[in-house]
Amino acid sequence: MLKKIIKKRAYEGNKIEDNLLFVTLQTQIVGLDMNNGYEQIFLSDKLSNMCNFYYDKDTKQLLVYNTSGHAYLYQMPEGKRLSQKLYLRAMDLQPDSIAHKGDYYWYSDTNFCLRRLDIKDGSTKQILKDKERRVVNVIQVADRLYIFTDMRREIEGYVKILCYHIDENGDLKYEFEWGERPYVFMGYVRRDFDRKTVIVGAKTYTKYVGDYYVAFEPENKRFVPIYPITDEAWELYGHTMLEENKIFAANPKYVKVIDIPSRKVLAKYEPEGTIYSATFLTKNKGAIFTDKGVYEITF
């Protein structure tokens, strides 16, 4: 069943609380109350080419940003703006590849280095700059940062993962590192429906044939293959719900709900327009984001 809940072009979306769905429109982030017929409860300031948002459940701070790295910070649920326009010095950030603690945010910048934003004064600082390697992703697990790096040049290399502890002053303390030679590149990161498991879109050549969604298990220093990335399940479109063994396999034309172990198609949806992404909202509901609007689906 398809139900249109927004009529405007929408690129991304995610739940920030159990009842709140936030959506990326062309120039703003809009917040909707799912318990009240998707009533609008928040609308951000405008930024051209809005990209996405990052929400910290503990502090309830919402960082919205555009493709060129301009951003605003808000305090939820009031929606009060906490800053003037910020400049992150980074482009096309993935929200699940942003880390936050206290007054600081960490992310990879336009030079593929690690950058830290200080929200007290809006300043940024470049750290972990390396001539041979570049930072491609940052994964936060509690007070640890796992920093994914790969070779700057297109030569045979491997992903090196550096682990740092965030101390009480917001400084990074080196702990350990390891290399993953089968993985040539890890570009896409998205949290599972449980918001704890990290799913990485990995181009793989040695351990597994082809490209896969893999679950990152930092405590075991390993990656577990979940589902192949194919023309049907594009890297930037899908979403997993591992607890229920389901995945949204999405591409620009349709979305399928698939049982992961059996690869059985449980449902297929073909909304009007071009599909940009899809996300699980509950165990039996989801949302599809298209150039014609946002659709709620029930399966």
Residue ranges and their predicted role:
Residues 34-37, 76-79, 118-122, 166-170, ...:
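Short loop/turn segments that connect beta-strands within beta-propeller blades
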Residues 1-38:
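An edge-strand/N-cap motif at the start of beta-rich repeat modules
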Residues 2-9, 38-44, 80-90, 123-129, ...:
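A short beta-strand motif characteristic of beta-propeller blades
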Residues 106, 113-120, 125-182, 191-193, ...:
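Solenoidal tandem-repeat scaffolds enriched in leucines and small polar residues
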Residues 273-299:
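Blade-level signature of beta-propeller repeat domains, shared across WD40, Kelch, NHL, RCC1
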Residues 28-30, 69-74, 112-115, 154-163, ...:
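Structural motif
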Residues 19-24, 60-65, 103-108, 144-150, ...:
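Short beta-strand elements that form the blades of beta-propeller/WD-repeat-like
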